[in-house]
Curated annotation (Swiss-Prot):
Disulfide bonds: none annotated. This is Cell division protein FtsQ. Belongs to the FtsQ/DivIB family. FtsQ subfamily. InterPro entries: Cell_div_FtsQ/DivIB_C, FtsQ, FtsQ_C_sf, POTRA. Residues 65-302 are periplasmic. It is a single-pass type II membrane protein. The keyword Membrane applies. The gene is ftsQ. Essential cell division protein.
Length: 302
């Protein structure tokens, strides 16, 4: 049977339809996607963001279940313990060196550590800070090794005893209290200072004690007066009043007079050096009475 010829219009439509089907141009969405992939930021986001999102979703699904979380944390803690609890990392005791018995006892109270313990669980910096806060401690070194927590102390050395309202304090050369004593006889080898503000002028006080060393045991104390100057207190109730400025030079002159004229060996109660231009000496009551009772004095008075 002979096929029926299509009309020219139908043949034209059929050709256009076949042409459209073979059109190599991309679709609208494909075109937009290709344009976006030409953008570096979008391309990097797709390349990096997609794996991150997939991993995040997987983690969320796994950790969203309590039994999965417990299983993972159990294995994690076991792995950590297998490393940190090894014998070479364990500390079983502590040792304190360089500290006096009283200071060592105070440090022991700060070492609140449940031994044995892993070095990974030790907060050495916190322990070092707490020990360094103790006033007698000048420097501290804390380190763990060989199964022992080693605490090495550099203790402040007292150079004087400060008599204050709350008792007798031991002071170092920087004016920092290192401890307290009950009686002066507990540290007789240390010089005695007293008065408000004496601890702030300890370097000057130690220099004055050095200059007064020729007087030996006659030196009893240095008393700070008005937080600005010193009085040197000697036995026999003698006092050397020093100026607020250049007290060292003033005391040197007094010591020179003692060596040349035995000034402090006489019946002198007070040597006033506060006025640099004029030295004033006040005699004892006994010396004044003896002076008044002299025959020449009585005759002159009559």
């Amino acid at each position: 049977m002979r096929p029926v010829d299509k009309k020219p219009v139908d043949r034209k439509i059929e050709r256009e339809t076949r042409y459209l089907r073979r059109d190599p141009a991309p679709s609208r969405w494909s075109y937009r996607y290709q344009r976006l992939m030409l953008t570096p930021a979008f391309r990097a986001g797709v390349r990096l963001g997609t794996p991150v999102i997939i991993i995040a979703l997987a983690v969320a699904v796994v950790f969203g279940r309590a039994d999965s979380r417990d299983w993972i944390m159990g294995h994690y803690n076991a792995a950590i313990a297998a490393v940190t609890q090894r014998p070479e990392f364990m500390v079983g005791s502590f040792a304190i060196t360089g500290a006096s018995p009283d200071l060592a006892l105070a440090i022991e109270g700060l070492v609140d550590i449940p031994f044995p313990i892993s070095t990974f669980n030790l907060d050495l910096q916190d322990l070092r800070t707490n020990i360094a806060a103790l006033s007698p401690v000048r420097n501290v070194n804390v380190q763990a090794g060989g199964g022992v927590l080693q605490i090495v102390i550099e203790e402040r050395q007292p150079v004087a005893v400060w008599r204050h309202v709350d008792g007798l304090r031991l002071m170092d050369g920087e004016g920092i209290a290192t401890g307290m004593i009950l009686n002066r006889a507990d540290r007789p080898e240390l010089p005695l200072i007293a008065g408000d503000g004496a601890q702030a002028a300890i370097p000057e006080a130690m220099e004055l004690f050095r200059i007064a060393s020729p007087l030996g045991a006659r030196v009893l104390a240095l008393v700070r007066m008005g937080e600005r100057r010193w009085d040197l207190v000697l036995d026999r109730e003698q006092i050397v009043q020093l100026p607020a400025v250049d007290a060292v030079a003033a005391l040197q002159r007094v010591i020179a007079q003692e060596e040349a004229q035995q000034l402090l060996s006489r019946d002198v109660a007070v040597v006033d050096m506060r006025n640099d231009a004029r030295q004033t000496i006040r005699m004892t009551q006994r010396a004044r009475d003896a002076l008044r009772s002299m025959p020449g004095r009585s005759a002159g008075r009559g």
